[in-house]
Amino acid sequence: MVEMKNPIKEADANPTINHLSLWRTDLAYFWVINCEANIQDDMHYHENDDHIFMVIEGECTVRTPHKEFVLKQFDTVLLKSGEPYQLCNTGKGRMLLLGAGNAGVDGKPRTRVPKIPSRIPVTEPVVA
């Protein structure tokens, strides 16, 4: 049986990046990220939790320690558990992302590892 939970609220991770929880089950959860231009979150990663992001509106640069991916509308990226990443709105307007994640791997709960300070300012050119 799948139990639907509806904790619709804003996350407090970064007050300029709005996270809206859509729904959560025992296996997966879904959310929307909304932020204005030239906003980025901190480099971080999740243990026991894969993420998929799809750009609904705007442009998102996904930075990892080894590569950058510039995503346009309807582009999608998979970030595996334990892979550090940073989401950056490098477009000229609002960015809307649809996020999906699993609720843990091999029975282990998902966790967010404390933020890893970014050394790349959002104003640097993005190499695609």
Locate predicted features.
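Conserved short histidine dyad/triad with adjacent acidic residue
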Residues: 31-46
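A short, N-terminal "cap"/entry segment at the start of jelly-roll beta-barrel domains
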Residues: 1-29, 42, 112-128
